[in-house]
Regions:
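Sec/Tat signal peptide C-region and signal peptidase I cleavage site
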Residues: 14-19
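Surface-exposed, polar/charged interaction patches used for macromolecular assembly or partner binding
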Residues: 20-402
Length: 402
């Protein structure tokens, strides 16, 4: 009897170990792009302090690694287009260099380490020992992989916000169009805000339409830049010299490249019975505007798209929703992480899915919980279009323009 009991316990232990291994595999870590958010600061605008505080203290984009520097605002100029001002500010303040410094945890002494890259890339610490890595094929591959998959995918998003109350929009529309029966875009607003309805004007006094013009940049990190950094600037705190410290501080090799710009509107709904103050409405509008313009930029620029892990494989679900711009027509490629002989991560397409319109799309937009406190929806459901079995931890990437 004791022997039988021991055998049963042994099989049970094996089963538990297998289940734990499978769960660990399903919860595989994945690499995110990194995002540094800035804004144009114009103190002359109404609620300037509220606008700035709402942006600076707002939530991070959960599909990106946060890579903000201390500098979050760029002083506005009198120009209608702030593009030239943004570029001049970035260059004068060595933003690209300081982004690299943050990647390598530069200390006050001037030394670097690989801790942040190790964490974000899920690397083994020994693989990223610089002194050893440069002397082995695998180590060199790991450094190249870190640059290609992590450092290179660092983006800078500069927002220029303009705030207009719904009441002001409605009044200007009424004057411009000669009545509420006409719906138009001559003021640059959506038709939902200019409808021929006296009820719309009744609630227009509370709530803001937010226009953000966003400019997207990307850190330039290529083989040449990496070689100069590792050969001429790299040193940890134990080996740093005044010459290397100064060489990095004086360096002009680090650059940002322009990706694109886009404009988006964010509408903060309100009602006659709202208890929210103007400051709270502006705070919500700021964050919703950022989410909205990121969605537009991602649809036009594949390199800016984020990966999202499947939350479950059967049914197929993911923690993604309206904040990411999902509609019932949204389609995604399903990607699987694979590691080659040198340890480099590759993403291979293994199928595709589309939003399952028999379920509601998760409303995860900023403030949605306040508007729908009883909602139990916390994920979006998908249908398989092609591919075999999918499992938790596989990554989905939205198809271009979808």
């Amino acid at each position: 009897m004791n022997r039988i009991l021991m055998l049963c316990l042994a099989f049970l232990a094996i089963g538990q170990t297998h289940a734990q291994t499978k769960t660990a595999a399903m919860d595989v870590a994945y690499r995110r792009s990194s995002l540094y958010k800035m804004m144009i600061d114009d103190p002359s605008r109404q609620y300037a302090d509220v606008i700035k505080n709402s942006f600076v203290q707002g939530p991070n984009q959960d599909k990106f690694n946060e890579h903000n520097l201390v500098i979050r605002t760029i002083p506005a100029t009198d120009a209608k287009d702030e593009s030239a001002n943004i570029i001049a500010f970035i260059e004068a303040n060595n933003i690209a260099r300081d982004i690299v410094a943050k990647w390598f945890d530069r200390s006050p002494k001037g030394g670097f380490d690989m801790k942040l890259i190790q964490t974000r890339g899920s690397y083994d610490a020994s693989d990223l020992d610089i002194s050893k890595a440069k002397m082995s094929k695998r180590g060199t591959a790991m450094l190249a992989d870190a640059g290609e998959d992590l450092i290179k995918n660092t983006f800078i998003l500069v927002n220029d916000f303009k705030y207009v109350s719904k009441e002001e929009v409605a009044e200007k529309t009424k004057m411009a169009l000669g009545g509420l029966s006409k719906i138009g875009g001559s003021l640059g607003v959506s038709s939902s805000l200019t409808g021929a309805s006296s009820e719309a004007l009744t609630v227009a006094g509370k709530g803001y339409v937010v226009k953000t013009t966003a400019h997207l940049f990307r850190l330039v990190w290529n083989e040449e830049t990496a070689a100069i950094f590792y050969n001429d600037y790299w040193a940890d705190d134990a080996t740093i010299t005044p010459e290397r410290k100064k060489a990095f501080e004086d360096s002009k090799i680090f650059k940002l490249e322009y990706v694109g710009s886009d404009v988006s509107w964010a509408d903060v709904q309100s009602s006659s019975f709202t208890q929210k103050t103007n400051e709270q409405l502006i705070e919500r509008a700021t964050n919703k505007a950022v989410d909205a313009v990121i969605v537009k930029l991602q649809k036009e620029h594949d390199e800016f798209k984020t990966k999202t892990p499947l939350f479950s494989g059967e049914p197929i679900t993911a923690k993604i929703g309206m904040k990411e711009g999902l509609t019932d027509k949204s389609k995604f490629d399903v990607m699987e992480q694979q590691q080659d002989a040198d340890g480099k991560i590759q993403y291979v397409s293994v199928g595709s899915v589309k939003v399952d319109d028999s379920f509601p799309i998760w409303d995860n937009r900023y403030g949605a919980q306040d508007e729908n406190p009883d909602s139990k929806i916390d994920r979006t459901y998908f249908k398989k279009v092609s591919g075999k079995d999918f499992y938790r931890g596989m990554l989905i990437v939205q198809k271009k323009g979808k």
